[in-house]
């Protein structure tokens, strides 16, 4: 996998075989970021990457200037890999080792997250949310 744009543009990252996840393809990632760049600015965005796996999406957001990136995955191998790579690449990514559904139910509603990214099997589901009169409004984008 590689980082497509931003401060780490062109950097290749090889995930260990111990991570039982497939990284999002460059094609799918380019599609996601093309859509996002047309509807919002990534700079200063706060991102929650659920089922982070290899951290591929987290690295891309952080490289492109997202203010805060929080990666959540229950696998220790994913947690270690993302934490190590983020430090090596000097990217601002906080990694949490926890079951995603447990994390969601215990997460504080006031956490200022601009974008939530779900990756399930091959599909990428991006939930773009914004606060409106105290509620989170979601727009679903499926690639």
Q: Would you name each region that the model predicts?
A:
Residues 1-143:
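Class I S-adenosyl-L-methionine-dependent methyltransferase catalytic core
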């Amino acid at each position: 996998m590689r980082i497509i744009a931003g401060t780490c543009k062109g950097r290749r990252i090889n995930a260990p075989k111990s991570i039982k996840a497939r990284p999002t393809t460059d094609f799918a990632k380019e599609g996601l970021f093309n859509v996002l760049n047309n509807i919002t600015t990534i700079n200063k965005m706060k991102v929650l990457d659920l089922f982070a796996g290899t951290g591929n999406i987290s690295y891309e957001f952080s490289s492109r200037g997202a203010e805060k990136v929080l990666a959540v995955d229950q696998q220790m191998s994913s947690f270690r890999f993302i934490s190590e790579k983020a430090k090596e690449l000097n990217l601002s990514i906080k990694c949490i080792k926890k079951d995603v559904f447990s994390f969601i139910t215990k997460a504080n509603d006031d956490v200022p997250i601009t974008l939530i990214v779900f990756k399930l099997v091959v599909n990428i589901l991006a939930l773009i949310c914004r606060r409106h009169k105290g509620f989170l409004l979601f727009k679903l984008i499926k690639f």
